[in-house]
Amino acid sequence: MCYNVGKNLNEVYVNMSTGNGVFDPIKLDGSWDIQILEPPELICNSLEEIAGSVTLTDNWLKINVPGSWETQGISPYFEGIGVYKKYFDITDQYYSLLKEGNIYLRFYGVSAWAEVILNGVNIGHHEGIWSPFEFNITDLIKKEENELIVKVIKPGKKFLPLRESLAGFLPDVCMPFGGIWKPVEIVIKKDISIEDIRIKSDIHKNELNLSLYINRDNDEKSLIEIILYDGEDVLLKKAEEIYLNSGTSNVQFKLKIDNPHLWSIDDPYLYRLEIKVYSGSELSDRLVKKVGLREVRYSGSNILINDSPVYIRGILHWGWYPDTVAPIPTEEVIREEISKLKEAGFNLIKHCLYVPIEEYFDIADEMGMLIWEELPLWVPKIDDKIKEKVYKQYNEIVKSIRHHCSIIIWTLGCELDETADYQFLNNLYNMVKGLTDGLIRDNSGSGECYGGLLNENADFYDYHFYTDPPFYKDLLDSFAAQWRKEKPWLFGEFCDSDTIRDIKRLIEVYGELPWWIFPKGFGINWNISYHRQIEKIESNNLSDKLPYLVKSSIDKSLVYRKLVLELARQYKNISGYVITGMRDTPIATSGIFNDFGELKYEPYLIRTINSDTAVTIQWDNRRRWINGGDRLIRWDRFNYQSGSIIRPHIVISHFGKDHIKNARILWTLEDGKDIIDEGEEYIECNLSPGMVNEIATLEINTPEVSDITKLTFRVKIYDTDLEEVIAENFWAFWLYPKISINKYKEFSVCLIDHCNIFQDVKDSIFSKFNLTSDISNCEVIITTTLNQELIGCIGEGKRVLYIQQGGGYIPVERKPFWRESIQIMEKHPIIRGFDNEKFCSQQWYSLATDTVFTSEGLDRLAGNNGKWYPILRRLDARNFDLDEYLVEVVLGKGLIIASTLRFQGGLGDEANGISLNPAGEYLLFQILKSLLKIS
């Protein structure tokens, strides 16, 4: 809140123009002095008292402005007061201009609380990281040796608690940053000045509506001149003399534009708007903005830009830049980020719980990248004090950036719970709605999911789903149900997928582990151990495998994201998504960019699903009469017995510019580089932009195979009118050899299934063997329970498969299979054919489990005389714990193969039974062959 000299000390908001003005500003950037001071131990009632409690010394250090102090030799954990000092002179020419107006000291951003003292006079303070502020210093400025002192307190634990400020999420990503992190300058304002502007397009009336907020010192007429440039040419010019009252006046203008060139993602055309105000015949102030003419609204579930449906394909940006800590990337970095994102098919960046620098918005306007601005309210301590801060700081923030045409969505906080009451959020929503356009929502993530409000203030639905692929369908069927009121439905963040950090390369770049990778203790205490990654992978003898782990985790991450995005694109009422996240951070490696700013995936691979028009596949529904009624049956869609027919339904999600009338489907089935089948179909699509429809069902005959075989199915959609491919995609399927009916009947297998996981015994692999219930008279035991009696049998020579999918004889932990981990396959005959990919892909879809054995539990099982050997392992991508899915345990004369894998499927939309899970059935077959010693 800004205190101004010459006014009573009430909080006054001034949203200054960021245009050119009449006079060039004096830049105060560069070298400053700083002292780092710890306040004495005393009870303070206010930040002003804390700032006043320190005593300056002669011990000044050098620091650069703008920038955070954490990157300039000051401990990231320092929470005292940073006292900045700068001496500056005013040039003769500039000083002579002072009589023509008022002089202001302008700060574009200080984190987070600043008290400003000029020439020994305390001129006020301001709280708020993200918004600019200024002070009138006309009566204090001197021609020579002005002394400027700024006392700064950053958010933390001591004086400005994180949850009582609007620090956003960066303190939880790494830590709160402190200092004068944006430029500082001195500007002159004459007697009339443009304080604020709101720009709104009406594309149906071909109008550009301007709302100007003009301040003047007295009541008088003023000439206002508006010029709109199309390139270098003057498109229109309008001048009007208007009577302005003393103080701030709101002046409205409508500019009629013939055949306007609209701004869009593919054609981000910008006009240049120049506004001049005169005092008599003299120019008093000047404002220049680049403006894009566009309209954002929604119809049903579709988001429309200039009346055209747009499918949101966003990336979540937390503002993490390790070299600067504060989110102040260079222009080069911003352009590179946006260019790479567009190349990968993204059309939106969600700036999550922070406000990027002005240059980011400028470049997004220029390059056609949509922006979702999420304002920085995160797990707040809600009381009247924080509410007052939110109202005032949001007013400042929104007014400072609302003119950018790239901003189309606003959210006012993230995952707020029941402490954020209806009246507060309703007031906030209405305030922001009155300040800007676009789609607005009070709570990203939805109060429905976090115990918050159900009567939300929202122009769209917004959910944050983080889960394994088998659970997405049930979530979507419930949360995106057709009975809900029709409006856009977005994933405000979702689909994170951690990869293994290339920690050795990170050390090579920094010379050591970077400071930011160590736990901080400021925000949330995450269960992460990146600082111990080398220690833990070395202790598990995985150090030599690090390059393999990094690559395999990236490959698996792409599979995961492709699975999830393809499913999301098949729902007509889902309007888009934001993927978590932009780049790897101190708390997660789920970025699509790694620590070095490199895209983890080939762009064309992401574009297969992340484009305006996407082709996906869906499958037949199946039912079965069970216990007197029909029940839905789920079967594995990625694995088939050789010779099966595969029936993919071709589904198009079309958000391109053109109506698709006629198309050709071109498909191939490939074994490695060899095409073993292909075909094409002509279809009448009749797809308008914004539609999601099935366009065809294909039947593909698969070959007979003698070993596990991976096939690749590729589809291209060719628009016969446009004569171009508008979408293409690919999928992997696996074929398994047929198992002879009579070949294994001589082998007796005892099945002990107290957990009832093999309900379809007669239709499955078990029918190939001589099934018995006699433990003593069998060659192999398959059991879902383990006890001392069986342990004794094993010691005497029995060979056992023990399947434990929950609590049981061996201690287990519950952990996701797909997220936050990578699977490691050791050389073993029972997974031959399952280990060709070197990572767990869709082949493992209905084998995936949420249960792992701990090494400590397996050590206890093996005891002093036994030994266990890993076959399939889980390495956690965040804390690097190593757990087990499939192991071989030697006990005495016998052997146990123990597994937590789900041979019968059953989690989420995995297969409902072993007979519907070819991969599970064949893996079980290979385990049985190994236990029976059959080659």
Predicted segment positions?
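Accessory carbohydrate-binding/adhesion or oligomerization-edge regions at the termini
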Residues: 1-72, 151, 155-158, 231, ...
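Short alpha-beta junction capping motif
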Residues: 776-816, 893
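Beta-strand-rich binding/interaction modules
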Residues: 118, 207-242, 251, 273, ...
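Substrate-binding/catalytic cleft of secreted carbohydrate-active enzymes
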Residues: 338-339, 348-597, 781
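Catalytic beta-strand/loop cores that center a nucleophilic Ser/Cys/Thr
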Residues: 808-812, 818-926
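Active-site-adjacent substrate/metal-binding segments within catalytic domains
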Residues: 66-90, 97-107, 111-118, 124-127, ...
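Accessory beta-strand-rich segments of carbohydrate-active enzymes
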Residues: 18-19, 26, 30-39, 74-75, ...
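Extended acidic/polar, glycine-enriched regions
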Residues: 142-145, 213-297, 705-739
